[in-house]
UniProtKB/Swiss-Prot annotation:
CDD domains according to UniProt: CysRS_core
Organism encoding this protein: Pelotomaculum thermopropionicum (strain DSM 13744 / JCM 10971 / SI)
Motif ('HIGH' region): 29-39
Gene encoding the protein: cysS
Domain of life according to the entry: Bacteria
A Pfam match: DALR_2
Protein name: Cysteine--tRNA ligase
Required co-factors: Zn(2+)
Alphabetical UniProt keywords: Aminoacyl-tRNA synthetase, ATP-binding, Cytoplasm, Ligase, Metal-binding, Nucleotide-binding, Protein biosynthesis, Zinc
Gene Ontology CC annotations of this record: cytosol
Cofactor binding annotation: Binds 1 zinc ion per subunit.
SUPFAM superfamilies cross-referenced by the UniProt entry: Anticodon-binding domain of a subclass of class I aminoacyl-tRNA synthetases, Nucleotidylyl transferase
Length: 484
């Protein structure tokens, strides 16, 4: 298995610190708001990484933090007249609601900054004693130029960073590049006692202290979004290696940005989507499927047409599963000649593994799922009202592969009673089938609009309205919702 390592800028053969065991840390959200689509991508992707490592037989210790002490939280709490820590806890609860909807499994540990202040103070104190950090008026700063390897993750030189430093430099710093490890207390902000007076930790030191506490030095995988490479992860390396004298992380993994209609997602452009708003319009399995449909290091563009295309693809997989479930209920007759072969399914399984072994290429892995759907459909069509014992075993193998691939990709939730994949919503719920039919109808309407056949397009819209389905034509594509 190979992983692209941001630190070395190449794919490397994966060799964990301990054979058979993987320790991984992923930077979690700063909990001052509901999570947005950009937060959801690393959330879903690194959940998939963890799932695949377990599938490969590794024991995985997965840690994902919550930053519940931060300037953004303090500012938001002041706006709302709330306590910063209480506000952060509330949004942590909302985070789990969105994560659960996207079928993201809980980490083994979810450390909070506010519960690890002694660990953070201890690490800052160690850096001060080693001469890597200095104290000014109750603030503690890391002295960047004393760490020889600074810039090795981002590929930036000190000269480049110096040129890009802001004009307004904190006069308390010895160098504009130095960053805060501990911030002196300000009125109205949460603070804790420390050897340098009351204050709170800086952002970067939090992740270092918590990851080192639970995973130790030179742990296996540290993940996060591409935007965290600099300064956050660069600073994590500097302070961690200065404190311990040991390599911090073996493999650094970073996912690409999400764009909306090929523009960067931002509040100012009005294209900033919260996960829960998206989940109000699209089923969670489709959102997860879409997020995994592109290689994690590539940008992922979100728009209505791409979601509709992903929806059509997902419906093909659902249809194949429905056919398999139905075929496996047919009677077995030994008088029926076997017509199916296991070989194509073995090849598909190998191609899925090869895709995931190649830097967790979920896009190619999903391609293998489509191959499985096509081959399963062919096998079902070849069999009759009764199937041979051999063919039934092959059909069951096809279903087992769907389950195996889903255990890695996590697209569908699993019914605890039957073990079936929940492809149509909750057990006994046909909402998924209804949604698929509506999307097919909308596809026909879209084709009519392209032909400028407005009469047909309007007739479809009016017919759906009579059934309680309202359509909204937007620049991102057509959206629908149930009336009332």
């Amino acid at each position: 298995m190979e992983i692209y390592n941001t630190l070395t800028r190449r794919k490397e053969n994966f060799q964990p610190r301990e054979p058979g065991r993987v320790c991984m840390y992923v930077c979690g959200p700063t909990t001052y708001n509901y999570i947005h689509l950009g937060n959801a991508r690393p959330l879903v992707f690194f959940d998939t990484v963890r799932r695949y490592l377990i599938h490969k037989g590794y024991e995985v210790l997965f840690v994902q933090n919550f930053t519940d002490v931060d300037d953004k939280i303090i500012n938001r709490a002041q706006e709302e007249g709330d306590d910063p820590l209480a506000l952060a806890r509330r949004y942590i609860g909302e985070y789990f609601k969105d994560a659960d909807a996207l079928n993201v499994r809980r980490a083994d540990r979810h450390p909070l900054v506010s519960e690890h202040i002694p660990d953070i103070i201890k690490m800052v104190d160690e850096l001060v004693k080693k001469g890597a950090a200095y104290v000014v008026d109750g603030n503690v700063y890391f002295e960047v130029r004393k760490f020889a390897g600074y810039g090795k993750l981002s590929g930036r030189t000190l000269e480049d960073m110096q040129a890009g430093a802001r004009v307004e430099v904190d006069p308390r710093k010895r160098d504009p590049l130095d960053f805060a490890l501990w911030k002196a207390a300000k009125p109205g902000e949460p603070c804790w006692d420390s050897p340098w007076g009351p204050g709170r930790p800086g952002w970067h030191i939090e992740c270092s202290a918590m990851s080192l506490k639970y995973l130790g030095t030179n742990f296996d995988i540290h993940g996060g979004g591409y935007d965290l490479i600099f300064p956050h992860h660069e600073n994590e390396i500097a302070q961690s290696e200065a404190a311990t004298g040991q390599p911090f992380v073996r493999y650094w993994m970073h996912n690409g940005f999400i764009t909306v209609n090929e523009e960067k997602m931002s509040k100012s452009l009005g294209n900033f989507f919260l996960v829960r708003d998206i989940l109000a319009k699209f089923p969670p399995e489709l959102v997860r499927f879409f997020l995994l449909s592109t290689h994690y290091r590539s940008p992922l563009d979100f728009d209505g047409e791409k979601m509709a295309a992903a929806g059509r693809g997902l419906e093909r997989i659902k249809t194949s599963l429905r056919l398999l479930y139905e075929a496996l209920e047919r009677p077995v007759s030994e008088g029926v000649q076997a017509v199916c072969s296991r070989d194509p399914f073995d090849e598909i399984r190998a191609s899925f593994e090869a895709a995931m072994d190649d830097d967790f290429n979920t896009a190619l892995a999903i391609g293998a799922v489509f191959d499985l759907a096509r081959e399963a459909n062919t096998a079902v069509q070849r069999t009759g009202p009764a199937v041979s014992g051999q063919d039934r075993q092959i059909l069951q193998y096809a279903l087992d592969l769907f389950n195996e691939f889903n255990e890695v990709l996590g697209i569908f939730k699993v019914d605890g009673a039957s073990g079936r994949l929940l492809i149509d919503g909750a057990a006994g719920d046909d909402s998924g089938l209804v949604e698929g039919l509506i999307n097919l109808i909308l596809e026909v309407r879209q084709e009519a609009r392209k032909r400028k056949d407005w009469s047909t397009a309007d007739r479809i819209r009016d017919g759906l309205k009579e059934l309680g389905i309202l359509l909204e034509d937007t620049p991102q594509g057509v959206r629908w919702k149930k009336q009332g």
